[in-house]
């Protein structure tokens, strides 16, 4: 390396300096001159022998850094470092495919009851249920209003004479009694004014001859007036016989209530409307036809005692929605339940009365308690 650098130094020097040096060196008397003096380049001589290595020169300045060398081979993988802190959550990924249905879990605890719903509309009153078992005797309630007068009871045993009481209020007129035996003829009274001629009655059966009466005083010779009086008496007797016959037939029904001149009775039998109507007609009456709240209350007492609904006589067979009595008269009193009559199912043409006294339109083919009116 050193000889190469020496040649570079010599080549860099100017030729003039080189020649002067050579001249000065050539004038000196130095042994073995050939080894020290270089030939002039103009002389084209042979190259000299290699010189000795000179002393090492001073260390030069640090040169500029060279270009980076090629990347070396990867080193061996180092040991795994400690786990770093948890990073922030990444963005949600796309939903994966739906998995298979899992097994049913155990039933959950019952939820809290929701708020109470609105009150629904009133349902239609159902049929009367079977009579329940009698409950324990309750406490005595307040004294009720005076009820409708009951039927005349049978004559009781004669009691001992009590002290004279105060005069009571007039009682309800009782049913006409049986016709008594004919009494003796009384004295003839003064002749009254002639009355209007009544309609001739039906000829009655010939009666049993009575006892001969006491001879009366001589009356006025107006035979026409006497005949009129006799005809009037016959008419009254016939009406009494008809009324008595009705009471006899009504007595066949064991349970009843009396209101004014009406009697409502039942035999505790249940029939369809037409059969019930025929049953009352054969007994000389008709199905119950309440025309007032008092009569309706008397019928209610009967059906409450039997715990059954009963048919009334009114229908709307002639005109839908217009109920009439059997005579064709429109109603003068009614006590319909709320929302009635509604002709449910399009075939409710008869009327039934519930144990609460309210009315409902009902199919005539149903069976209901028979209550007759006399």
Swiss-Prot record:
It is found in: Secreted, Extracellular space, Extracellular matrix; Secreted, Extracellular space, Surface film. The keyword Nucleotide-binding does not apply. Residues 45-221 form the Collagen-like domain. S-nitrosylation at Cys-34 and Cys-39 alters the quaternary structure which results in a pro-inflammatory chemoattractive signaling activity with macrophages. InterPro entries: C-type_lectin-like, C-type_lectin-like/link_sf, C-type_lectin_CS, Ca-dependent_lectin, Collagen, Collectin_CTLD, CTDL_fold, Surfac_D-trimer. Keywords: Calcium, Coiled coil, Collagen, Disulfide bond, Extracellular matrix, Gaseous exchange, Glycoprotein, Hydroxylation, Immunity, Innate immunity, Lectin, Repeat, S-nitrosylation, Secreted, Signal, Surface film. GO terms for molecular function: carbohydrate binding; identical protein binding. Residues 38-222 are annotated as: Disordered. Glycans are attached at residue 89. Residues 1-19 form the signal peptide. SUPFAM superfamilies: C-type lectin-like (SSF56436), Triple coiled coil domain of C-type lectins (SSF57944). Residues 49-64, 203-215 have a biased composition (Basic and acidic residues). GO terms for biological process: innate immune response; lung alveolus development; respiratory gaseous exchange by respiratory system; surfactant homeostasis. Oligomeric complex of 4 set of homotrimers. Pulmonary surfactant consists of 90% lipid and 10% protein. There are 4 surfactant-associated proteins: 2 collagenous, carbohydrate-binding glycoproteins (SP-A and SP-D) and 2 small hydrophobic proteins (SP-B and SP-C). Belongs to the SFTPD family. Contributes to the lung's defense against inhaled microorganisms, organic antigens and toxins. Interacts with compounds such as bacterial lipopolysaccharides, oligosaccharides and fatty acids and modulates leukocyte action in immune response. May participate in the extracellular reorganization or turnover of pulmonary surfactant. Binds strongly maltose residues and to a lesser extent other alpha-glucosyl moieties. This is Pulmonary surfactant-associated protein D. It comes from Mus musculus. The lineage of its organism: Eukaryota, Metazoa, Chordata, Craniata, Vertebrata.
């Amino acid at each position: 390396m050193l000889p190469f650098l020496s040649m570079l130094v010599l080549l860099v020097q100017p030729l003039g300096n080189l020649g002067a040096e050579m001249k000065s060196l050539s004038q000196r008397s130095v042994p073995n001159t050939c080894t020290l003096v270089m030939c002039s380049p103009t002389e084209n001589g042979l190259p000299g022998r290699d010189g000795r290595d000179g002393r090492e020169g001073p260390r030069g300045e640090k040169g500029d850094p060279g270009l980076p060398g090629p990347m070396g081979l990867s080193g061996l993988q180092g040991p795994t470092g400690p786990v770093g802190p948890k990073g922030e959550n990444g963005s949600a990924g796309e939903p994966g495919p739906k998995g298979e249905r899992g097994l049913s879990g155990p039933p959950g605890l019952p939820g809290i009851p929701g708020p109470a719903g609105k009150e629904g509309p009133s349902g239609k009153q159902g049929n009367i249920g079977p009579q329940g078992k009698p409950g324990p005797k309750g406490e005595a309630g307040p004294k009720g209003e005076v009820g409708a007068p009951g039927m005349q009871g049978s004559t009781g045993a004669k009691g001992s004479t009590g002290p004279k009481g105060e005069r009571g209020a007039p009682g309800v007129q009782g049913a006409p009694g049986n016709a008594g035996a004919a009494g003796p003829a009384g004295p003839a009274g003064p002749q009254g004014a002639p009355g209007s001629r009544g309609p001739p009655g039906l000829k009655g059966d010939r009666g049993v001859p009575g006892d001969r009466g006491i001879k009366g005083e001589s009356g006025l010779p107006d035979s026409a007036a006497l005949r009129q009086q006799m005809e009037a008496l016959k008419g009254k007797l016939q009406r009494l016989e008809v009324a008595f016959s009705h009471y006899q037939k009504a007595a066949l029904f064991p349970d009843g209530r009396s209101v004014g001149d009406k009697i409502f009775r039942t035999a505790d039998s249940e029939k369809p409307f037409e059969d019930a109507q025929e049953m009352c007609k054969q007994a000389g009456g008709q199905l119950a036809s309440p025309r007032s709240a008092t009569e309706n209350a008397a019928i209610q007492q009967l059906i409450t005692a039997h715990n059954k609904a009963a048919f009334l006589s009114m229908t709307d067979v002639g005109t839908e929605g217009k109920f009439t009595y059997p005579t064709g008269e429109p109603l003068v009193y009614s006590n319909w339940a709320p929302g009635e009559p509604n002709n449910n199912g399009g075939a409710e043409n008869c009327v039934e009365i519930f144990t609460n006294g309210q009315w409902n339109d009902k199919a005539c083919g149903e069976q209901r308690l028979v209550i007759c009116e006399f």
